[in-house]
Amino acid sequence: MLPRLVLAVCLFSCTLTGWAQQLTGRVLAASSGRPVAFATVGIKGKALGSTADERGHFAFAVPATLSGTDSVVISCIGFRALRLTVGQLRAPETVWRLQPQAQTLGDVQVRHPKLKPAIIGRKAVGGLAYWSARDTSLNVASDERGREMLTVLPVRRSCYVDSFRFHVERNDFKLIRFRFTLYQITSGRPTRELLTDDIQFTLLSQQTGWVSLDLSAYNIRLRKGQTVAAGIQWLQSEKLDPKNAVLGGTAAFPSVGHRVLVRSKSEAQWRSYPFNMSMYLAVQEFK
């Protein structure tokens, strides 16, 4: 038997070495004044940022040398992204208000009776590769929040999405909260978020196996010929061991024609890897 290849992707790990400053603030909805729970905050083009907590508060560490003119993006599905600078974010106890995103009312979609169940993605489990999300951070200001992992999926027939599933082989966490993400792919990179609802779900303590998220209520329709990327964004977690925790699973490698996209924070650069995770969309496609 061939030995399993451990891919050194380091999807969710970081360190505080040489970092001397925390950026803090709070995110509220401009219309209601309520907290925007789990809004993302990221430094444009850099692996720096975090997510807000349930009360809209955020905090994350940055190098003392970070320029005050670097761009910051605060965003959440359902709201218009707010763009500012690191210099503005350095002001203490600042509140940032997000404006609601104008929603275009589309036609009511009635599912065609001639539909059949299908899978877009990889339903098999196992492979020569092993992906892992490792958190060795001792400080909530510099943890794995805001990081994303997606699988690229070509849509061969128009369809409605019933559910999203991915397989977990190891889980050392007491709880993990994720956001389901779905992007339009252009020239190999995510270009547009396709969801108008903020869809979140949780993994319970040491939960492994197939994780399933029911999406049938959201009426998500994909078009024939479209390429999308579906996956997860890490919002919040609690470790069983405060010093170390790992979330991991298997993947097919090498996988010709398949790609996984990863970025370490919400505004970091995307990285592409030639492996195929056990992650898929269950759909009802047109015959």
In which residue ranges do the predicted regions lie?
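Hydrophobic beta-strand segments
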Residues: 33, 39-43, 72, 110, ...
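Short Pro-Gly-centered beta-turn/loop motif in secreted/extracellular proteins
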Residues: 60-69, 220-223
